[in-house]
């Protein structure tokens, strides 16, 4: 069943917003959905344990019955880089450990599954490992969320180069307009479309309501080979 790894050109550029929108689009088409965000920092302490807003957003768009811990097996309270949070907590943060956790979700064989990373492509784990090593172990095609603002072309092209250099397929990309005041916006988008070696799955404007349904209206799953 189709599964994809979602990464972004940076942190705070709307990876989860886009991932939840993609899941919603799949659900609306009658597909079963599942998701994983294997590591998250900036979590809130609740009576049920640490909870991350991004992981909860993904869980809300999963049609399969998943426990929170299946979606987000490693949660850390400090809003810092995951490898620093794990080090402070004395927790192993290896690509192999995350891989084993994600495989449990993939084994459910939903019609459409997303695995969302943290930050960008080269976010450190432990030792010399990066989150990209998890993506390589999983072998999933990648969806790149481009936070459209000044500097995004360089970030997007470098990210795409790294993804392909790691031997993974770039299945598609999404233009998420995080700064509508970006100078020469249309020209920037045209350059991205010309230079990125993958189809664009949609252009998401800055929305007053950035809920999954509103975002899904601007996305197209067909370039991913998903029949709708």
From Swiss-Prot:
Keyword set includes Lipid metabolism: no
Names of the cofactor(s): Mg(2+)
MF terms (GO), sorted A to Z: ATP binding; dethiobiotin synthase activity; magnesium ion binding
GO CC field: cytosol
Chain positions recorded as Mg(2+) binding sites: 16, 54, 116
Subunit structure: Homodimer.
Family designation: Belongs to the dethiobiotin synthetase family.
Name assigned to this protein: ATP-dependent dethiobiotin synthetase BioD
Source organism of this protein record: Pseudomonas paraeruginosa (strain DSM 24068 / PA7) (Pseudomonas aeruginosa (strain PA7))
């Amino acid at each position: 069943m189709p599964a994809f790894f979602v990464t972004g050109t940076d942190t705070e550029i709307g990876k989860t917003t886009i991932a939840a929108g993609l899941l919603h689009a799949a659900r609306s088409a009658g597909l079963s959905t599942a998701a994983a965000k294997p590591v998250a920092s900036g979590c809130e302490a609740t009576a049920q344990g640490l909870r991350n807003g991004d992981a909860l957003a993904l869980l809300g768009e999963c049609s399969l019955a998943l426990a929170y811990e299946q979606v987000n097996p490693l949660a850390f309270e400090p809003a810092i880089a995951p490898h620093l949070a794990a080090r402070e907590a004395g927790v192993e943060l290896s690509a192999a450990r995350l891989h084993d956790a994600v495989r449990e979700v993939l084994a459910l064989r939903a019609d459409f599954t997303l695995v969302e990373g943290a930050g960008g492509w080269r976010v450190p784990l432990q030792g010399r490992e990066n989150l990209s090593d998890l993506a390589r172990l999983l072998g999933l095609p990648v969806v790149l969320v481009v936070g459209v603002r000044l500097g995004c072309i360089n970030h997007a092209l470098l990210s795409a180069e790294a993804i392909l250099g790691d031997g993974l397929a770039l299945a598609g990309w999404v233009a998420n307009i995080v700064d509508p005041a970006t100078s020469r916006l249309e020209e920037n988008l045209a350059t991205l479309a010309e230079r990125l070696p993958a189809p664009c799955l949609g252009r998401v404007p800055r929305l007053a309501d950035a809920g999954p349904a509103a975002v899904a209206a601007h996305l197209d799953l067909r370039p991913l080979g998903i029949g709708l």
